[in-house]
Amino acid sequence: MATVIPGDLSEVRDTQKVPSGKRKRGETKPRKNFPCQLCDKAFNSVEKLKVHSYSHTGERPYKCTQQDCTKAFVSKYKLLRHMATHSPEKTHKCNYCEKMFHRKDHLKNHLHTHNPNKEAFKCEECGKNYNTKLGFKRHLALHAATSGDLTCKVCLQTFESTGVLLEHLKTHAGKSSGGVKEKKHQCEHCDRRFYTRKDVRRHMVVHTGRKDFLCQYCAQRFGRKDHLTRHMKKSHNQELLKVKTEPMDLLDPFTCNVSVPIKDELLPVMSLPSSELTSKPFTNTLQLNLYNTQIQSMQSSASAHQMVATSLPLGMPCPIDMESVHPSHQLSLKYPLSSTSYAVSMPEKEQPLKGEIESYLMELQSGMPSSSQDSQASSSKLGLDPQVGPLDDGSGEVSLSKGSVPISEPLNTPSLDFSQLFNFIPVNGPPYNPSVSVGNLGMSYTQEEAHSSMTQLPPQTQDPQDPSNSIGLGSLHSLSAAFTSSLSTTTTLPRFHQAFQ
């Protein structure tokens, strides 16, 4: 039987075995065998020691290759991390506010703003809080510098003065100390420095003299866009307000393809010739009421003529929609009444003869009788005695309304002839002209519409030997003469007014 000798090799091996499980962290971590000659730091590789040495010498061998970017870095890793900022694509997204970042560490620093239980580094001397450990160390270094300790709390490097220490602290985070931004970008033509490269490019117009921004209102040029914007708000504020309030789609004022309703007061005025607009104002209410009667008759025949295309002297080639004309609307005077004019009162309009004349015109519409017997019968309906004397007798039994005579039914009969009523058109005369002038007001009609128009001609001397005129309408003839004289002249109006009072 074998005996166990103390100090046996197998026993030594068993006692030197490492227990199973995880190794200690200190045993697996390589030793820092490469110390820095300028400070007390040591590194586990030559590459890390070399990168650290750049912090003492200020050398940055890895430069950015982008145009207009002068940044340089101490390591290749930091250069690649910086190159991501030039890319338009931001791959790191915040899950709380959907903000995008180029770098992961920027996103990590941003997430502290959303975390209510975030770790805050608080300074015991002044009470300030910091989200990052690097910012907190930089802040502690500032307190140490003010107290006389010129050692950097980040890299434990000692400096000879406070100014050098402050400049060294800027290199750790790339930010200025104390929250004050540094003007790192200098102009190539002068000694001015700026915060960003964009400010440098904007400043270059001072040296080049280029003014590429033009004001659209006064043609003044500016070298910078913000100067143009300031000029627009200061000098052209009213123009900017008009641009904001005006609609984008403006109608063409010269041509139109749709029917435009015209105001009732302007309709008879626009139908006048341009010479009569200034020479002959409306001085008679009877003339205006004649126009109201014609408008009513034109509207009543709207089944055959929906749109009346008129040639207006005002340069408006738009068709007039007659549906917009109200038949009951009285036309207002453009000029005040003169001394020879008179207004029609409401009691005069309500004379009993108004209904009889209206029924007579309806009888004329149904068919105009050609024989003298029918004419006498129609005149008897009016209640006019053939033996009545002239109007100058002042009998006053028959008073005619000086207002407009409304036509309730459309006058579409082609046989309609007002010569039987007014008796001043020759029997065998030429046919009426399609272009009819009513009261020297010049309303134009087509041949189809001219059958309902009234024609004024100079009064004819009545031939007593003509059997066609001896139909017993002497009083009607005298009435028509006074009626037509009131249309043409204004001097006989007072006499006409006195005769019917």
UniProtKB/Swiss-Prot annotation:
Q: Where are the zinc fingers (C2H2-type)?
A: 34-56, 62-86, 92-114, 121-143, 150-172, 185-207, 213-236
Q: Which InterPro entries match?
A: Zinc_finger, Znf_C2H2_sf, Znf_C2H2_type
Q: Which GO terms describe its biological process?
A: gland morphogenesis; multicellular organism growth; negative regulation of gene expression; organ growth; positive regulation of gene expression; positive regulation of glial cell proliferation; regulation of DNA-templated transcription
Task: Cite the GO molecular-function annotations of the record.
Answer: DNA-binding transcription activator activity, RNA polymerase II-specific; DNA-binding transcription factor activity, RNA polymerase II-specific; RNA polymerase II cis-regulatory region sequence-specific DNA binding; zinc ion binding
What is the top-level taxon of the source organism?
A: Eukaryota
- What are the boundaries of the region Disordered? 1-30, 366-406, 447-474
- Quote the Gene3D superfamilies the UniProt record gives: Classic Zinc Finger
| Biased composition range(s): Low complexity | 366-380, 455-467
**Location(s), subcellular:** Nucleus
Function of this protein? Answer: Transcription factor and proto-oncogene whose activation results in up-regulation of target genes, such as IGFII, leading to uncontrolled cell proliferation.
Q: What is this protein called?
A: Zinc finger protein PLAG1
Q: Which organism is it from?
A: Gallus gallus (Chicken)
| Gene expressing this chain | PLAG1
